Regions:
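Short secondary-structure boundary/capping elements
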Residues: 12-16, 41, 106-113
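Cofactor-/ligand-binding subdomain signature composed of acidic, glycine-rich
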Residues: 1-34, 38
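Short secondary-structure boundary micro-motifs
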Residues: 6-7, 17-18, 35-36, 44, ...
């Protein structure tokens, strides 16, 4: 899995701040072409979401850790930016709202909790659920998406590795190969 592989940058603690900033910028510069290579999947996911919203459904984001927080941020910005009601785009994070500010260890490993969290909102076949996971293998997210597909609920995924496990439980999956992080394993940086 590329996001978890060793960084190309060594001895970070010995570098000055300018070198650190330049190294991070070099890594980030690689992403534009990689995101562009997924344009058709990104467009397909947008079409899926649009069709569900047009039909009266809602958009749910599911994630753990930073991925869950990013879904919550986007859901929070949609009402003021696009004028949609606050209950139209909903972000859900493993571990509940307390995990927004403080990590809830091992919440991401629960295969069954994701669908239970969605059920609290009355998720149904009009809705679309997008899982967000840098690794593409987070049990909380995959379990929720699998349960949604079994119930006829549209699913999508946003992943930072190719050929992820999430692809198997998504109607549309965007898989951007972000590569190793500047700080090995720190997927909140680039992924």
């Amino acid at each position: 899995m590329q996001t978890e592989s060793s960084s190309h940058h060594r001895n970070l603690e010995a570098l000055d701040f300018l070198s650190l900033v330049q190294g991070i910028n070099q890594e980030d510069a690689l992403l534009h072409a990689r995101v562009a290579s997924e344009a058709s999947h990104i467009a397909a996911l947008c079409e899926l979401v649009f069709s569900r919203l047009q039909a009266g459904g809602r958009l749910f984001y599911m994630g753990a850790g930073t991925s869950g927080r990013l879904g919550i941020v986007d859901a929070s910005e949609c009402p003021p930016t696009y004028g949609v009601p606050f209950d139209k785009v909903i972000g859900i994070i493993a571990g509940g709202d307390g995990a927004i500010r403080k990590a809830v260890e091992f919440a991401e490993d629960d295969w069954d909790q994701g669908i239970l969290d969605l059920e609290e909102f009355g998720v149904n076949e009009k809705d679309v659920v997008i899982g967000i996971a840098a690794s593409g293998r987070t049990p909380y997210v995959i379990g929720a998406l699998r349960a949604c597909r079994e119930r006829g609920i549209a699913t999508g995924g946003v992943v930072c590795n190719k050929e992820s496990q999430m692809r198997a439980v998504c109607d549309v999956c965007v898989e951007v190969e972000t590569g190793p992080e500047f700080v090995t394993g720190s997927t909140r940086m680039k992924a």
